[in-house]
Amino acid sequence: QGEIIGIIENSGAGKSTFARCLCGLDKKAKGMLEMDGASYDAKQRRHISYMVMQDVNHQLFTEDVLDELLLSMDGEDEKADTARAKEILNSLDLLDKVKLHPMSLSGGEKQRVAIGSAIASGKKILIFDEPTSGLDYRHMLEVSDNLNRLKELGKSLFLITHDPELIYKCCTYLLFIQGSKVLWHRPMDGEAVSLLRAFFSHAQEAGAVNASW
């Protein structure tokens, strides 16, 4: 709880399957998640987790941006929900888009709307699949700031990412998947930074990512 866990992998190593199991969307998932002294099976995890997909076009459903965030909220207090949704949109530089149809936005703007919906949901576990894909550096920083605020609120965040700058800005723990298995996991310390540098240097040489140090 109150952690941002970065999940990195060699391409096709199973991170998306891992994410689907974590949030209870994979029917083959059999394990239990233990958190705060409680255990959650796959069905229970669906009620406490929210996943933002890499292709956010599959999870934008409403007629305008504001309603997209309201859709993920409990709806008990419409006035309070609307105020909170606008606050989130403002933090994501989207307040001027509230009445626009989500599908009319750019790819980066759609990504931020989906992230806003995750924030608005209030779920304990938030899973983001490449949340900065298509975003410029300024908006990456805004996403990072929002993720850090969620961490401070006690949320558990999982970031599937190949963005080293995002990892350095907000991750507190790292998990590396290779061959559909967890090869190593550790806090974001000096050893983790060394392992990250080696991973991204190799990936950059292979042309898989663009990394700056």
Show the residue positions of the predicted features.
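Helix-to-loop junction immediately C-terminal to a conserved catalytic motif
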Residues: 23
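Conserved ABC ATPase "signature" region
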Residues: 80-97
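Conserved ABC ATPase signature
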Residues: 101-105, 109
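Catalytic Walker B motif of ABC-type/P-loop ATPase nucleotide-binding domains
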Residues: 126-129
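H-loop/switch region of ABC-family ATPase nucleotide-binding domains
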Residues: 161-162
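A short, surface-exposed alpha-helical micro-motif characterized by mixed small hydrophobic
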Residues: 167-169
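Conserved beta-strand-loop-alpha-helix hinge in the C-terminal portion
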Residues: 181-204
